[in-house]
A protein has these predicted regions:
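N-terminal organellar transit peptides
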Residues: 1-67, 71-184
């Protein structure tokens, strides 16, 4: 049995975060082994477009499509022992038998890399090198980043936990409230 993660249920919830005046910010706890690339990227785009303070905390794993989900927030944290895995787009059990399938996978991967580059400042070429790195994982390509390694690579803003992420979020919410009051 293959474990996958689906993100469809998040899309209407993210819309509510933006639309509901009683919600002042968003705190994302990320612990995923990956899953649906299309929905994951859609959720990441929605998170990035929210005009309220957003913060993410990687607390276990942020593998595959979890990377764009993690970096979509205004501020990103990773627990010291949490991992992020960057690897090429793939589909379990699929044999690529047509050039169109390969091109489709390449298009999905390019969309993901472009999003991560835009939200981290890490160059596309560096992200692609990490995705195809050999030797770090048995029978697979990719790079495993643990805690501060993700910060050193520029993918995550800082190492921290719940208290640091909430502290940042509360500061930003207060700053947003003050700006709204000044406009009145």
């Amino acid at each position: 049995r293959i474990k996958t993660t689906k993100y469809e249920h998040l899309l209407p919830l993210l819309t509510q975060v933006q639309d509901n005046q009683e919600i002042d910010g968003l705190f994302l706890l990320i612990n995923t082994v990956g899953g649906d690339c299309s929905c994951g990227l859609a959720a990441a785009e929605m998170i990035a477009s929210i005009k309220k303070p957003t913060v993410s905390l990687v607390i276990g794993d942020s593998h595959s499509i979890g990377v764009p989900l993690s970096v979509a927030a205004d501020r990103t944290f990773i627990a010291p022992t949490a991992t992020m895995i960057l690897h090429p787009v793939r589909l379990n059990g699929t044999i690529i038998g047509a050039p169109q399938t390969f091109e489709y996978f390449r298009l999905i991967q390019d969309r993901i890399v472009t999003f991560v580059e835009a939200h981290t400042g890490v160059a596309k070429s560096r992200l692609e090198r990490m995705m195809i790195r050999q030797g770090m994982m048995v029978k697979d390509l990719g790079t495993i980043l643990v805690g501060k390694m993700a910060v050193e690579e520029g993918i995550i803003d800082e190492v921290g936990g719940v208290s640091e992420a909430l502290f940042w979020l509360h500061q930003e919410i207060e700053r947003s409230r003050k700006k709204r009051q000044e406009k009145k």
